[in-house]
């Protein structure tokens, strides 16, 4: 039995994670990238068989099963609203969300399949568990998180550091 590929919209396709996702997704026969969304109007509408859309054109994107969002906080609300309106799943790694956006995320999780994480790496998931265990074992202790990043890092402190600090 052959199933059809999962149709994917990649939101934030011009960023580091978005570009990495695009490279991998177009090679996976189980996936079909139906749209790549970037902030500004693209120079080319189709690149390597993938249709590109400006963020302002998001509502004109074709139907998709799941949106994968690694954008910026200011681009997050429209993709969340589109997923809810279309009943599509959302996977998001966008960090720096404000309280209203976090609440909208929680509300949407009751209506659509949704996963959000500040960092999707296995190493950080294990680190997060270890930090929780250490905090429980050492009540009354203080700790600091010190981090360094490449020069292109857009959010500091990082979403990962903020999650660990929670």
Model segments located where?
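Extreme N-terminal starter segment of soluble prokaryotic enzymes
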Residues: 4-8
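N-terminal Rossmann NAD(P)H-binding glycine-rich loop of SDR-like oxidoreductase domains
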Residues: 11-22
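NAD(P)-binding Rossmann-fold cofactor-contacting core
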Residues: 24-47
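Hydrophobic beta-strand scaffold residues
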Residues: 33, 52, 90-91, 113-116
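Short acidic low-complexity segments
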Residues: 49-63
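N-terminal Rossmann-like NAD(P) cofactor-binding module of classical short-chain dehydrogenase/reductase
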Residues: 67-68
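Rossmann-fold NAD(P)-binding glycine/threonine-rich loop
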Residues: 80-81, 85-86, 93-114, 125-134
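Conserved anion/nucleotide-ligand pocket segment
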Residues: 122, 126-166
């Amino acid at each position: 039995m052959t199933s059809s590929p999962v149709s994917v919209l990649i939101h934030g396709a011009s960023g580091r994670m978005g570009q990495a996702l695009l490279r991998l997704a177009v090679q996976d026969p189980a996936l079909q990238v139906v749209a790549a969304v970037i902030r500004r109007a693209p120079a080319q509408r189709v690149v390597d068989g993938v249709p590109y859309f400006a963020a302002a054109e998001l509502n004109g994107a074709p139907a998709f099963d799941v949106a994968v969002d690694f954008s910026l906080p200011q681009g997050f609300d429209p993709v969340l609203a589109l997923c809810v309106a279309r009943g599509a799943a959302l996977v998001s790694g966008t960090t720096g969300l404000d309280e209203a956006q976090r609440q909208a995320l929680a509300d949407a999780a009751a209506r659509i399949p949704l996963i959000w994480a500040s960092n999707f790496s296995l190493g950080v998931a294990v680190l997060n568990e270890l930090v929780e265990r250490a905090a429980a074992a050492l009540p009354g202790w203080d700790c600091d998180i010190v981090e360094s990043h490449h020069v292109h890092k857009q959010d500091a402190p990082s979403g990962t550091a903020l999650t660990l600090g929670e």
